[in-house]
Regions:
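Conserved P-loop NTPase motor module
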Residues: 14, 31, 134-180
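Short amphipathic C-terminal alpha-helix that caps PH/PH-like domains
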Residues: 32-40, 125, 129, 165, ...
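Hydrophobic residues at beta-strand termini and immediately following loops
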Residues: 17, 115, 161
């Protein structure tokens, strides 16, 4: 059967896709990921027909998103807010990304959180996280982070925080519970 992305978005459904290169191979993971992203983008763009105040928010979470970046992904980032799409991206470091995508992220993303990073990324992010310096980023202790929030359309002053330490609960034991 096929996936109806319009239905998923309209009914706030969750789609989980495991694109593990180890399970399906690198080429298959990238191809499937790109197909899903293009279908999702087409469904998101159709929301232009819905009055803005009637668009319910929809959220896209992409881990290791550097594997799925295209030029159209940059345009999705720049237009996501007006279509009611919240985008949550994670990756390891900026060097994995084309320059156009880096610019799209820094120009359009409201909230950025960073844990300890290398000097090259610290050079980039310290400009976004004043008063924190590149040395502050490279010397963060385990579980500590810097964050810059978007609140009511305005960027907050960057601040530091400490995340909870992971507990020893196995996620695989909670899978059924999470899916419910």
């Amino acid at each position: 059967d096929t996936l109806d992305f319009d239905y998923l978005i309209e009914h706030n459904k969750i789609l989980l896709v495991n694109l593990s290169k180890g399970k399906i191979g690198e080429t298959n993971a990238q191809m499937l990921g790109l197909i899903i992203m293009s279908k999702l983008q087409a469904a998101i763009l159709k929301r232009a027909k819905i009055e803005p105040e009637k668009r319910s928010p929809y959220y896209l979470y992409v881990d290791e998103f550097q594997n799925l970046v295209t030029d159209t992904f940059a345009s999705l980032l720049s237009e996501s807010r007006k279509y009611g799409l919240g985008v949550h991206l994670t990756n390891q470091y900026f060097a994995q990304l084309p320059e156009k995508i880096k610019d799209a992220i820094l120009g359009n993303v409201g909230t950025i959180i960073a844990f300890e990073i290398g000097m090259e990324d610290a050079e980039i992010l310290s400009k976004e996280f004043e008063p924190f310096t590149k040395e502050d980023f490279t010397n963060l202790r385990k579980y500590n982070f810097y964050i810059r929030l978007m609140i009511d359309g305005k960027t907050s002053k960057a601040f530091s925080g400490e995340s909870l330490k992971p507990n020893n609960i196995s996620i695989s034991n909670l899978t059924e519970e999470i899916i419910k």
